[in-house]
Swiss-Prot record:
Residues 1-7 are cytoplasmic. The chain crosses the membrane at residues 8-28. Gene3D superfamilies: Nucleic acid-binding proteins. PANTHER family: CYTOCHROME C-TYPE BIOGENESIS PROTEIN CCME HOMOLOG, MITOCHONDRIAL. It is a single-pass type II membrane protein. Keywords: Cell inner membrane, Cell membrane, Cytochrome c-type biogenesis, Heme, Iron, Membrane, Metal-binding, Signal-anchor, Transmembrane, Transmembrane helix. One of its GO terms (biological process) is cytochrome complex assembly. This is Cytochrome c-type biogenesis protein CcmE. Belongs to the CcmE/CycJ family.
Amino acid sequence: MTRKQRRLYFVLLGMAALGGAVALVLTAISDSLVYFYSPTDIVSQRIPEGRRMRIGGLVENDSVVKDGKTVTFKVTDVTNAVPVVYTGVLPDLFREGQGVVVEGRMEAGGHFKASEVLAKHDENYMPKEVAEALKKSGQWNDGKQPKQ
């Protein structure tokens, strides 16, 4: 093998290794991304089961059912609602009519299996994603929560 061929071989090998490393990094990044959806987005789009995501909205009035450590409730953007099942301890500020962001996966039957529930921290705060979803659906009332 001549010197020129050897150099070309190492350059090609280096480019292949770099391409493989970039592919691994991109795969890791795409696996760790968590997309945000409103209940209307979930109802109007075909969301694949098992995909990790966040849903934001308000806890629908009269929808919270506690059964031991398992809690079932609905997250709504006033236009549509998504049933959520969560097993664990809820945040102290979790209650009906309050803003919430839940992280988890869609499951068969159209319910959302939450692994984490995040509640807003005071009556004036609305998570950015929830506020944008309410504005998009036309339910935003100048920073105040919509009436259900």
